[in-house]
Curated annotation (Swiss-Prot):
GO biological process: fatty acid biosynthetic process; malonyl-CoA biosynthetic process
Protein name: Acetyl-coenzyme A carboxylase carboxyl transferase subunit beta, chloroplastic
Quaternary organization: Acetyl-CoA carboxylase is a heterohexamer composed of biotin carboxyl carrier protein, biotin carboxylase and 2 subunits each of ACCase subunit alpha and ACCase plastid-coded subunit beta (accD).
Residue span of region Disordered: 25-48
Catalytic activity: N(6)-carboxybiotinyl-L-lysyl-[protein] + acetyl-CoA = N(6)-biotinyl-L-lysyl-[protein] + malonyl-CoA
Organism: Helianthus annuus (Common sunflower)
The keyword Ribosomal protein is annotated on this UniProt entry: no
NCBIfam families reported for this sequence: accD
EC number: 2.1.3.15
CoA carboxyltransferase N-terminal domain ranges (all copies): 216-480
Known function: Component of the acetyl coenzyme A carboxylase (ACC) complex. Biotin carboxylase (BC) catalyzes the carboxylation of biotin on its carrier protein (BCCP) and then the CO(2) group is transferred by the transcarboxylase to acetyl-CoA to form malonyl-CoA.
This protein's record includes keyword Glycoprotein: no
Family under the similarity heading: Belongs to the AccD/PCCB family.
Subcellular location(s) per record: Plastid, Chloroplast stroma
């Protein structure tokens, strides 16, 4: 994105944003590169402008824009100006190639401007701006029109929220915006000179800046809005724009659900091997496991342990979709089974947060056997010991997890807009040669069909679980 200032007599408070378009209340100053380039062409440009009429300032220069919106203002490189003596000049500049030209022979440009404005209707082309009825009558309206176009363009084309346009007090947002714009101004030197359309150039470079700073933002899967990652966790990974429930890591879910200082993990040292010596042309299975362990800091796709939820002791397993898509291998099945057996022995309520793509194909039939093993342990926990199990289905919950412990709860809870299915839409359509309707695998649609009991947003989830446990005679330890 080219970083530059356009100073003009728009009589409006200066503002700066990612497009770096600002307006000065004092003068039509030099059009310059914000990176303070030492290019001699730029220096010559400043001198040429300052030589007009022998003045050092431009408070008496009137600036005309024959435009209907800001898109034309930005894309048009030719401007029509009138100095204090009534002489009219045309300015042409090309920031990419450092070209600046001044011409006072402009009959076609001037006549085109008069034809497209109400100036012709007034029948006045006075050389003296003090007696020009067009200037006196319409200057305020024209300035407001340009300002309105600028505000509209910034909001619609550059996706800047209205509170940013009006000047936000959020210093962190301003700092981020200025940092991004500062970097983009330097990186603009590498833009392709063959790209002539500034709107296209702006859009492509804006995308590059977004990609460059993607470690600062989380993009919503629903509305594609950007959420600042620093505050994203405190908002429970909910989109600030549309409220969509985005994916959470297992560690964040544990922090959300379990009381601080009460989490005790189980079987952390259990890791996967390569039981069937699965070989892939892309990457060996063992190398993939090592890669995900380094990436996520986890040993497997599930964390299990015990903790307190509003003072109530619970056993909880949380699957992590970031680790190989939350796929269920032999280690995942073994850790969940051991947790269920521990909860059975200690008479603890059980929570399993599901986020999985299904059984792990790299372990073959061993991964499929985990479905039966976990279901068998749950049968003893629920039917024989009469204990309380709550699965929480998050997005996505598919495959073998849906076909086993995901749907065996006493009370089944789903998150809003969660993707819940046995087979994915693409697999069904290719296998059955039938079209799967959009939304037919969403939590809201499946709730109407009776697949689970509750759809609970993240904000009240902990209190809902606490009430369910107390309803089933599980009470806080410190309660009298």
């Amino acid at each position: 994105m080219k970083r530059w200032w356009l100073n003009s007599m728009l009589f409006k408070k200066e503002f700066e944003h990612r497009c770096r378009l600002s307006k000065s209340t004092s003068s039509l100053g030099p059009i310059e590169n914000a990176s303070e380039s030492k290019d001699p062409n730029i220096n010559d440009t400043d001198k040429n402008i300052q030589s007009w009429g022998g003045h050092d300032n431009y408070s008496n220069v009137d600036l005309f824009f024959g435009v209907k919106d800001l898109r034309n203002l930005i894309s048009d490189d030719t401007f029509l100006v009138k100095d204090s003596n009534g002489d009219i000049y045309s300015l042409y500049f090309d920031i990419e190639n450092h070209i600046f030209e001044i011409d006072n022979d402009h009959p076609e440009l001037e006549s085109s401007f008069y034809r497209n404005s109400s100036y012709l209707n007034n029948g006045s082309k006075s050389k003296n701006p003090e007696h020009d009825p067009y200037m006196n009558d319409t200057q305020y309206t024209w300035n407001n029109h340009i300002n309105s176009c600028i505000d509209s363009y910034l909001q619609s084309q550059i996706c800047i929220d209205s509170y940013i346009v009006s000047g936000s007090d959020n210093s962190s947002n301003n700092y981020i915006s200025s940092s991004i714009c500062g970097e983009s101004g330097n990186s603009s030197k590498n833009e392709d000179a063959r790209t002539s359309d500034p709107i296209i150039r702006e859009s492509s470079t804006d995308l590059d800046v977004t990609q460059k700073y993607r470690h600062l933002w989380v993009q919503c899967e629903n509305c594609y809005g950007l959420n600042y990652k620093k505050f994203f966790k405190s908002k429970m990974n909910l989109c600030e724009q549309c409220g969509y429930h985005l994916k959470m890591s297992s560690s964040d879910r544990i922090e959300l659900s379990i009381d601080p200082g009460t989490w005790e993990p189980m079987d952390e040292d259990m890791v996967s091997l390569d039981p069937i010596e699965f070989h892939s042309e892309e990457e060996p299975y063992k190398n993939r496991i090592d890669s995900y362990q380094r990436k996520t800091g986890l040993t497997e796709a599930v964390q299990t342990g015990i903790g307190q939820l509003d003072g109530i002791n619970v056993a909880i397993a949380v699957m992590d979709f970031q680790f190989m898509g939350g796929s269920m291998g032999s280690v995942v099945g073994e850790k969940i089974t051991r947790l269920i057996e521990y909860a059975t022995k200690e008479f603890l309520p059980l929570i399993i947060v599901c986020a999985s793509g299904g059984a792990r194909m790299q372990e073959g039939s061993l991964s499929l056997m985990q479905m039966a093993k976990i279901s068998s342990a749950l049968y003893d926990y629920q039917s024989n010991k009469k204990l309380f199990y709550v699965p929480i289905l998050t997005s996505p919950t598919t495959g073998g997890v849906t076909a086993s412990f995901g749907m065996l709860g006493d009370i089944i809870i789903a998150e809003p807009n969660a993707y819940i299915a046995f087979a994915g839409k693409r697999v069904i359509e290719q296998t059955l040669n039938k079209t799967v309707p959009d939304g037919s695998q969403a939590a809201e649609y499946l709730f109407q069909k009776g697949l689970f009991d509750l759809i609970v947003p993240r904000n009240p989830l902990k209190s809902v679980l606490s009430e369910l446990f107390q309803l089933h005679t599980f009470f806080p330890l410190n309660q009298n």
